[in-house]
C-alpha cells in the first residue's frame, strides 16, 4: 500500500510539472510577442542591456524600454564553487531533454539526503521505486520517441563539436516535426539527422551532408531527402550556405593566421559580387579561396592538405582556384 501511495505522489508531481511547463511556455510566448519590433524604424534587431536594464534598437539606437525586470539572481558569485553553493535552483529548462529537464529522478547511489547509506532493508523498496519512477518519466510512445531521438541528436552534435544553441535549435525542429506527425513512415535517426542539418544552417554553423552522414546511422541520400521534406512542411526559411561561413573552421583546421583568414573572406566577397560563387559548391569555393590566401600570405598549404580539411577533391580546388585567380586578376606565383 505504501508503494502505491508513493507512486500516486510521483504521478501527482508529474502532472504538476506538466502544468508548470504549460505556464512557462505561455509566459515565453507572451514575452516574445511584446516589444519585438522597434516602434521607430520597425527593426527586429533589439538588444537587452542587462547592466542598464534597457531594451535598445540596434539599428537606430532608440531606447524602447528602460525598466524591464532583471531575471537573474540577487546574489553575486566570483567562482564556480560560490555559484554552486549559492544557487537555489536546478538546471535551466532545455529542449534537448524529452521532459525539458523539469522532472526529477531517484539517484542510483543508495544514500539519503545527508549522505548516509540506505539500510539493506530499504534498498529493495528503493530499487522498485526507482524502476517505476523511470517508467513514469517516459509514459507514452511520443515521449519514448523524443527520449531516443534527442539522445541521438546529442550524440551526433557532440561528435561534430556543435555549440549549445545548435543543439537547442535542432531539438525544437524535431519537436515541431513530431507535433505535425512528420515522423510517420520515416526513421527516427533520419529525421534527427535532418533536424540537426537544418539547425546548423539556421545558426550559421554549417556542416555538410557528408559530415552529418558520417556521424549518423543513415545514408547521406536519406538525410537529404528527409531534410527537404521537413523544411518544406515546417516552412523553414533557410538561405543558401555562404562559402564565407566555412572559412573560420577550415583555417582553424589548417592552423592559419587571422590575416590569411581575412584575406580569404575578402576574396570570397569579391567573388560573390561578380557572381562567381553561384551554382558551385560552397566548400570547394571556400577551399580555393583559402588556398590562394595561404600562398599570398606566405603560409603556403598544399592542395592535398586543404582538400582533406575541406572534404573536397584536389581537382575541385584546382578548378575553383584557377577560376577565381583569372576572374579576380589575382597573380599567384607557385
UniProtKB/Swiss-Prot annotation:
TFIIB-type zinc finger locations on the chain: 34-65
UniProt keywords, alphabetically: Metal-binding, Repeat, Transcription, Transcription regulation, Zinc, Zinc-finger
Start and stop residues of the Sequence repeats: 151-234, 245-326
CDD domains per record: CYCLIN_TFIIB_archaea_like_rpt1, CYCLIN_TFIIB_archaea_like_rpt2
Listed name of the protein: Transcription initiation factor IIB
GO biological process, one term: transcription preinitiation complex assembly
Assigned protein family: Belongs to the TFIIB family.
Annotated Zn(2+) binding sites: 38, 41, 57, 60
Summary of the function given for this chain in its UniProt record: Stabilizes TBP binding to an archaeal box-A promoter. Also responsible for recruiting RNA polymerase II to the pre-initiation complex (DNA-TBP-TFIIB).
GO CC, one annotated term: transcription preinitiation complex
Domain of life: Archaea
S-S bridge residues: none
GO MF terms, alphabetically ordered: DNA-binding transcription factor activity; TBP-class protein binding; zinc ion binding
Species whose genome carries this gene: Methanosphaerula palustris (strain ATCC BAA-1556 / DSM 19958 / E1-9c)
Amino acid at each position: 500500500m505504501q508503494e502505491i501511495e508513493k507512486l500516486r505522489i510521483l504521478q501527482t508531481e508529474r502532472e504538476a510539472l506538466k502544468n508548470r511547463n504549460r505556464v512557462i511556455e505561455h509566459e515565453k510566448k507572451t514575452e516574445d510577442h511584446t516589444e519585438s519590433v522597434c516602434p521607430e524604424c520597425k527593426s527586429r534587431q533589439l538588444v537587452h542591456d542587462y547592466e542598464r536594464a534597457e531594451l535598445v534598437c540596434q539599428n537606430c539606437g532608440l531606447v524602447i524600454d528602460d525598466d524591464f525586470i532583471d531575471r537573474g539572481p540577487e546574489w553575486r558569485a566570483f567562482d564556480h564553487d560560490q555559484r554552486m553553493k549559492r544557487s537555489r535552483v536546478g538546471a535551466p529548462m532545455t529542449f534537448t531533454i524529452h521532459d525539458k529537464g523539469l522532472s526529477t529522478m531517484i539517484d542510483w547511489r543508495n544514500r539519503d539526503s545527508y549522505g548516509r547509506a540506505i539500510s539493506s532493508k530499504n534498498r529493495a523498496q528503493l530499487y522498485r521505486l526507482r524502476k517505476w519512477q523511470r517508467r513514469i518519466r517516459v509514459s507514452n510512445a511520443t515521449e519514448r520517441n523524443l527520449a531516443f531521438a534527442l539522445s541521438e541528436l546529442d550524440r551526433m552534435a557532440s561528435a561534430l563539436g556543435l555549440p549549445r544553441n545548435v543543439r537547442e535549435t535542432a531539438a525544437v525542429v524535431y519537436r515541431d516535426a513530431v507535433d505535425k506527425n512528420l515522423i510517420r513512415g520515416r526513421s527516427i535517426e533520419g529525421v534527427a539527422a535532418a533536424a540537426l542539418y537544418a539547425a546548423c544552417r539556421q545558426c550559421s554553423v554549417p556542416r555538410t551532408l557528408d559530415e552529418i552522414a558520417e556521424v549518423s546511422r543513415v545514408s547521406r541520400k536519406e538525410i537529404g531527402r528527409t531534410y527537404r521534406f521537413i523544411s518544406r512542411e515546417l516552412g523553414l526559411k533557410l538561405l543558401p550556405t555562404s562559402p564565407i561561413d566555412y572559412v573560420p573552421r577550415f583555417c582553424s583546421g589548417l592552423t592559419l593566421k587571422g590575416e590569411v583568414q581575412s584575406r580569404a573572406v575578402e576574396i570570397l566577397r569579391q567573388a560573390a559580387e561578380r557572381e562567381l560563387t553561384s551554382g558551385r559548391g560552397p566548400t570547394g569555393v571556400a577551399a580555393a579561396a583559402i588556398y590562394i590566401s595561404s600562398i599570398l600570405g606566405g603560409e603556403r598549404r598544399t592542395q592535398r592538405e586543404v582538400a582533406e580539411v575541406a572534404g573536397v577533391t584536389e581537382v575541385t580546388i584546382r578548378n575553383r582556384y584557377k577560376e577565381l585567380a583569372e576572374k579576380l586578376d589575382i597573380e599567384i606565383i607557385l
